[in-house]
Structures are given as C-alpha cells and as structure tokens.
Amino acid sequence: MKLEQLMEGVPFTLVQGSLDTEIADIIYDSRKAAPGLLFVCIVGTQRDSHAFAADCAAKGVSALVIQHDIDLSALPGVTVVKVESSRYAMALMSANLFGNPARQMTMIGVTGTKGKTTTTHMIKSVLEAAGRKVGMIGTNGIYYMGRHKDTANTTPESYELQKTFREFLDAGCDTALMEVSSQGLMMDRVAGVHYDVGVFTNLSPDHIGPGEHKTFEEYRSWKGQLFKRCDVGVVNIDDENTAALLESHTCKLVTYGRDEKADYRETGYELLRTHDFLGVAFHVTGKDVMDVKVNMPGEFSVYNALAALAVGKVLGLPDAAIHDGLGKCVVKGRVELVPISKKFTILLDYAHNEVSTESLLTTLRAYKPHRLVVVFGCGGNRSKLRRYGMGEICAKMADFSILTEDNNRFEKVEDIIADIREGMNKGNPDAKFVEIPDRLDALHYAVDHAQEGDLIAVIGKGHETYRDREGVKTPFLERELLEEYAQQIGLE
C-alpha cells in the first residue's frame, strides 16, 4: 500500500521522502525492523522509541512516523512523516492497512470497572442465540468462529486490534464485540473505531497509579469517552458515577437497573443453588416484560444480564434469543463452578482487588453456605494496597481463608502473604486463616478440609492458565488441577 493511502484521515507533515513510498506493513517494535516496513515511533511511559529510529533506518525500513523532531542525518533515503500523536496515527493507519474492517461489522464496546468480561460473554451468547456470527475481544482472550487466542491486554494495541477485526471479517463474522478499557481509550488503541452500541457496567476506583490514571476523575473521564464514539449507550442508571461519566455524551441513551426510570428494570430476583449450580432468576419490566434465569450467581449477575438484555433489544433481537442466550451463558473463570463433590461447592473467580472481592463474597454469602472459604493470594510487583484491602475484606467476610501465591513475579511469596496478613489482622484480629505458599498445595488443602455445605471460592486467577514465578510462566489450570485431584482421591 502507498504511504499516501495509509495516511488517509491522519493529519501529518511530510518531513522528507515521498508519499508514493510502498509500505508492506506497520511495526512499532524496533526489533522487527526490516526493508519495506513503516516504523511508528511511540513515546511510552517507560521509553521513547524515537531513540531507535536510526537503528530501524539502518535495517532498511521504508518510512518512519515521528511525534517530535529527531536527527535526520542518520535517515538518508527514509521517508519521514510527523504527526501530533503517533499512537493516534498508528490506530488510523492500521485501520487503513486492513481495509477499515470495523466499518463493515456491527460494533459493540463494553466498559466499566467490574463486569466487563461477564457482560461481554452474555452479549455474545445472546447474539449467537439469534444467529449472529460474533468475534469477541477481552480479558479472557479473542474468540471467533470456534477459535481462541490469548491477548496481552484487555484492549489490544491498535495494530493488533485492527488485524483482529480483519480476521473476524474474513472468517465471516458480522459483529465485533469487545471490552474497552480506560487504558485502551487513553492510549488511542480504539481511536477511529465507532461503535453501534456502547455499554457501561459500573465504576469504582481502580487502575489509579504509576503508568495508569493519576486520579479517579481522570479514570472516569476516559471511561466516558466511549459515549462520544457510539450511536447508542446502554448504561447502568443505578451507578452513582453515571451522570458524571456521561457529562459530554453524544449518543442516544438506554438505561437499565432498579431505578423506576430505567428502560429495563429488575423488579425482583430469587437466588438458586444446588451443589453444582449457583444462579439467579429475575423479573424485568419497563420497555419490555420478561422473566430471566441466569446460570451465574448474585446481584451483579442481574446487572450484567440486564445490560446484555438491553443490548439485545437495541439491536432488535427476538425475546426468545435473549432468554435462551442468557440462560445458557457460562464464563470461564468468572464465578465458574467446578462440580467435583456433592458435599460442597467450589468455584473459580478472577476477583483480584478489594472491590471485586467484596462484591463476590457479598454475593456468595447471600446463598447462606455452612462456611464461606476463600483461597487467594495477590500479585507480586503490584500495589500493596490490594494486598491490605483483599486481606481486610476476606477477614471480615469469610469464615476461613487460605493465603497462598498468585503470580509472584519477582517478589517472594512470603513477603506478599505478610502484607495480606497485615490486612487480615486489621479487618478482623480473630479471623481464621492458614498460610500455604504453594497454590497447588492450597487447592488440595481446601478440598481435603471441606465441610458439608461449604462454599469455597478460589479467587485471583480465574481464566488464567499459568502461574508466574520469577518471570517464568508455567502451566497452571485450576479447574483441571481440581478435577484431577478429586479423581485421584476418589472424591464423591
């Protein structure tokens, strides 16, 4: 593709060279530099890749995109264009490179602090029940037409995102559904993407710190950007941050929740439990009247299902598809039951901060188990506040806790557990817990010491398939490990 075609819609200045330059592909990793490629120089939080421009030129790249002035003497024969924001430019250039695939599909984006992944899966289930062919991108990875790929970020970098949209379209997808993180919005990963429907789940403090957002207000503001980029916004009317988040929205709004003004309103729900089922049934009124049963527990499942229901109605899907899609949806690693015993219930969940842990335990406590047991750790090289917070919440809300590892990365598990213990002691000095550093041993302990009617929540990893020790990732699939152990000891 000619550089001129690649730059369509991008404000730029040609510094040197020609717009007739032929470009085979776009890169933003200097290690991939090769003849025929265009290298985008990005100013990152840790490093500025403009420093690698000369090295890329020496490796034969055909063109460079820069955000600030650099020494051109080392770039003979290389076309150079200057833009105001290289991240923004890369997003639009990537869309052009792959033929603007997002314009040829129904686009749905979901944002919020909690519930993005579950809501996205519920929407996917509803769409597929209606016969739609869906490509989905989010925390759990990329799914389309029976295929699955892992992704490093909830919202992939713009080049990977546009490439994925192209793969969706080529595979026959008519709808692209994705989680849209505040980081993805702030870092222009979704720049140039317009959504038919944007969804807001809820908002609470998270992702605030070095390399993320400076303040909660900034975090909220970036979340709100989605509703300047969609035709219809499906939003949680009950969240206290909704009004501020939508302050400058440009889309039509459809609301859901319990407020009497909600377009789709839940007016009563019932908790459902057996040893291998935790769910909820609820009644919907407002613009439609419907009874819904969801194969996931608790109040937050009601909200997630309401969001998916509202999206289905906005898109004109049949009520039967909405009902069936919600009824059969199961999300890997999100309150995911592992039915290994009729004596107790054990589940996996991705809850990995204070807010999500409190929400989960509040939900599980409502099912009135004999004991609520939590198996958890906290990630290494991450904020200690999460450790104190999760420890405090579990001490207050669980009957028994098993403290163990999560992804230690480059920290000692004993140091991480010590921080969690500090939070436990603050939350409840009389809290009952045990410390088992190895997570596999912790899983075995939970099973071996389970009592009749217990509800055991193994939290923090959820859908993850590995554990990270000293930067080395090794396979660790909690569902399989629990099933194997149950079979090994002859559990019934």
Task: Locate each region found by the language model.
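Short glycine-rich anion-binding loops that position phosphate/pyrophosphate groups of nucleotides
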Residues: G44-Q46, S182-Q183, S204-H207, D239-E240, ...
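Acidic, Mg2+-coordinating active-site environments of NTP-dependent enzymes
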Residues: G9, I70-P76, A171, D196-I346, ...
